[in-house]
Structure formats: C-alpha cells, structure tokens
A protein has these predicted regions:
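Membrane-anchoring alpha-helices and their flanking helix-loop junctions
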Residues: 2, 10-221
Length: 222
C-alpha cells in the first residue's frame, strides 16, 4: 500500500529486505568515507596541518561534504545532471584549500594546482553541457530514484575524486621547490599528452553522437 505525495511514495508496510539494502548502502557510503579518511590521515604524516587537523585528511572530508551536500537536491529533484559537475567543484575546492594553506606557494605547486583546475573545469563543463543536451544519463535511470543507491554513487565519486588527486594535493601541501626536479617535467609532458588525447576523444565522440545516422550506436574508433 502506498500514498503518493509530490511525486514521492510512502509505503505503509515497509519491506524488511528493502530496508536491509538501504542500511547496507548507507553503511557502504560511510565505509567509503572512512577509506578516504584513513588514506588522508596516512598521507598527512609529516605534512602540514590545516586548522589543527591533518591537511590531506581535512581536504578529503571537504570533498565528501561537497558531494553529500549536492546529493540532497539531486535526489529530491531525481536528477543526475549535477553529478559530474559536483566532481569538478570538489576538485577545485580541494586544490584551493591546499593552495591557500601555504603562505608562500612555490612555482611547482602553483603549476600543479593550475593543471588540476584546468582539467577539472574542462571535463566538468563538457559533461554538464552534454547531459543537458541529451537530457539524461542512462546510467542513472534506476539509481536516482533510490536514496541509498544514489548516495553510494555520490560517495564513490567523492572517493574517486580524492584518490585521483591525492598525490597532487600532497605535492601542493608539501610545497617543495621546482629546482632539480626532473620528474616534474616528465609528469608535465605526460599530463599534456593525456589532456590533448582526452579533449580530442571527447570532441570525436560529440561529433559521433550529433550524427543522426549513429543513433543508438557506440563509437568504436577514433
């Protein structure tokens, strides 16, 4: 039995199995948060504190807070359109905290922070425009109607954002000089190649999707 109100359905006889799955998903979300905190704490050893807390661990917490905050209106509106841009906001916020935690940021840290920002902005805006043009992301058909499952997806994104940027954040926080760091230039070249490849691939896929003849097909070359 159910009562529909403003698009939501409240069951008068809750299913115990469904409640069990909901609890598991919520616990999984907190487990993912705990993983980020543990890695953040371990990576903070020997590094600076921010507001008396281990720097990298605090930054990880901010990333999850941003994801969980934007999850609330996303679930209420049953929309996935802000999922990817949430990652972009988290990337930029986390990098920003790392940058402003130091009074005198070395050029090395400045460049890495800039690379994070450029990459996150480019990808996030591209995905945001695409989902609004297409109207939906098919991955979220069933997920976005479930509070606990949608929360897990946002939590996984938060962990992914932190893990993929943890090394760069550590570099910024440690704030060492660029002088004599050959690995930095090797990494910069790899980043430039990867960024150019990603931009090219996204443009090829955009043109593929805009071609009506390819409707329902998957791009397999490029």
């Amino acid at each position: 039995y159910g009562l529909s109100h403003f698009g939501y359905t409240f069951k008068t006889k809750p299913d115990s199995t469904s409640q069990g799955k909901i609890m598991i998903n919520i616990l999984l979300s907190f487990f993912l948060f705990a993983i980020a905190l543990i890695i953040g704490y371990a990576g903070s050893q020997g590094g600076p504190n921010i507001f008396s807390y281990p720097g990298l661990m605090l930054i990880a917490s901010v990333g999850f807070f941003i994801h969980w905050l934007i999850f609330i209106p996303s679930y209420l509106l049953k929309t996935e359109k802000y999922y990817d841009i949430t990652g972009t906001i988290a990337y930029m916020a986390m990098a920003g905290i790392a940058v402003f935690s130091s009074h005198e940021l070395h050029l090395r840290s400045q460049i890495v922070a800039l690379l994070i920002t450029v990459w996150a902005l480019r990808l996030g805006l591209f995905l945001l425009v695409r989902v609004f043009q297409v109207g939906e992301d098919k991955r979220f058909h069933e997920v976005k109607t479930s509070f606990s499952r949608f929360l897990v997806w946002f939590s996984m994104s938060a962990l992914w954002v932190f893990l993929t940027t943890a090394n760069a954040l550590t570099l910024i926080l440690n704030n060492t000089s660029l002088i004599g760091d050959g690995y930095f230039f090797i990494g910069l070249i790899i980043w430039l190649i990867g960024f150019a490849t990603e931009v090219t691939a996204d443009e090829q896929k955009r043109r593929f999707r805009n071609n009506a003849e390819n409707n329902g097909q998957f791009i397999n070359n490029g």
